[in-house]
């Protein structure tokens, strides 16, 4: 793997504005940050760096196109042969990049390995702003839970989605004056793309009838890489195909595809494996599905948003824990687990309640449409404060 370590040609415009470095590496980060990236590019001297954590075009490139984003200014190509090498490369490449371009502040979102670039920023005394801070599912089997703790603790300003998340941050001993509840950035992204989502012709292209298919996404490490969980989940998926006797469109990520091929597991013929879909197509499929069965972290946010705009869908989360309890507070989705009995019961319940018009209530923090404005103003407000009070730069 040819890792890019020379960033001597990378520089900000030096136009007098605050110099902000945003680092991403995965599809969910790109989606959630889309509106924030655009706003930061407008008001800051902004560089966008991609670690290369998800290298597949269908997982990354297509979303830059769909969301109207410019390509990253820097591509690190930091993926190694194993987890240890990848994490080391991300920190090393980030350190080299920040040493070369000297940002005033850096912004990361979420709990991916790419967020561990914040470690480099901390050692270089660069103020760190962390969106999606404070999310906790209290499940140690999730690698993301470790990343959350690390990045929350070392960040200078944590931007939480909800009061639940703020509470978790306070329990960690973080100072309340460095924690803000901004709400989720997803509504801003979804609302600005709603016309394209509604206009998608994905059903015609895939030969699907609206309301007569189940949309499936299963890709999380704990569901795919753990043998017991993998077999439990995919046996349950086959049982779901047999019970409902309709197409199950499986948006199949590389991790899942490789695991299925290696295991030799035979999916029911009604389960249709498809390459990961674009942003507009996937959301159009969601809002017209008989049910959406997914282990994606954004499912509760998407369900809440589409309910708020009159496109509710039965949302079933194939996990045993959630870091978004505020969405359960408002009944935006059903937590199903990964065994056959629990999954089938959860789908039945979610579908029937949707038919009865019992949709739950949109989460107030998930329908905020000025999150990007909040983020820009908080970064502008606190970069100097961190420089003075934490690093004593002046």
Model-predicted segments: where are they?
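Nucleotide-activated sugar donor-binding and catalytic core shared by glycosyltransferases
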Residues: 1-246, 256-394
């Amino acid at each position: 793997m040819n890792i890019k370590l020379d960033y001597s040609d990378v520089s900000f415009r030096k136009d007098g504005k605050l110099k902000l470095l945003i680092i991403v590496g995965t599809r969910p980060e790109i989606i959630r940050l889309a509106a924030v990236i655009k706003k930061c590019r407008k008001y800051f001297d902004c560089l966008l760096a991609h670690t290369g954590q998800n290298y597949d075009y269908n997982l990354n490139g297509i979303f830059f196109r769909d969301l109207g984003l410019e390509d990253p200014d820097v591509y690190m190509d930091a993926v190694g042969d194993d987890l240890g090498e990848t994490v080391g490369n991300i920190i090393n490449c980030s350190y080299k990049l920040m040493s070369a371009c000297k940002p005033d502040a850096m912004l990361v979102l979420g709990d991916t390995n790419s967020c561990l670039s914040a470690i480099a920023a901390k050692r270089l005394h660069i103020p760190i702003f962390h969106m999606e801070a404070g999310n906790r599912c209290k499940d140690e089997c999730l690698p993301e839970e470790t990343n959350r703790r690390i990045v929350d603790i070392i960040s200078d300003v944590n931007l939480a989605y909800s009061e639940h998340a703020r509470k978790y941050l306070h329990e960690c001993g973080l100072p309340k004056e460095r924690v803000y509840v901004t709400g989720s950035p997803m509504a801003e992204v979804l609302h600005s793309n709603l016309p394209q989502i509604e206009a998608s012709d994905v059903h015609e292209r895939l030969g699907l009838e609206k309301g007569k298919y189940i949309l499936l996404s299963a890709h999380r490490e704990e569901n795919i890489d753990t043998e017991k969980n993998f077999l439990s989940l995919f046996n349950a998926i086959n049982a779901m195909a047999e019970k409902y006797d309709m197409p199950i469109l499986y948006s199949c990520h590389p991790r899942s595809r490789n695991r299925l091929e290696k295991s030799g597991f035979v999916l029911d013929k009604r389960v249709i494996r498809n390459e990961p879909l674009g942003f507009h197509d996937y959301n159009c499929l969601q809002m017209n599905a008989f049910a959406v069965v997914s282990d994606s972290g954004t499912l509760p946010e998407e369900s809440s948003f589409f309910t708020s705009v009159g496109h509710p869908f039965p949302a079933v989360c194939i996990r045993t824990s959630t870091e978004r309890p505020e969405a359960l507070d408002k009944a935006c989705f059903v937590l199903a687990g990964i065994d056959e009995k629990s999954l089938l019961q959860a789908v039945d319940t979610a579908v029937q309640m949707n038919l009865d018009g019992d949709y739950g209530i949109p989460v107030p923090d998930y329908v905020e449409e000025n999150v990007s404005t909040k983020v820009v103003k908080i970064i502008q407000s606190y970069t100097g404060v961190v420089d003075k009070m934490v690093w004593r730069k002046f």
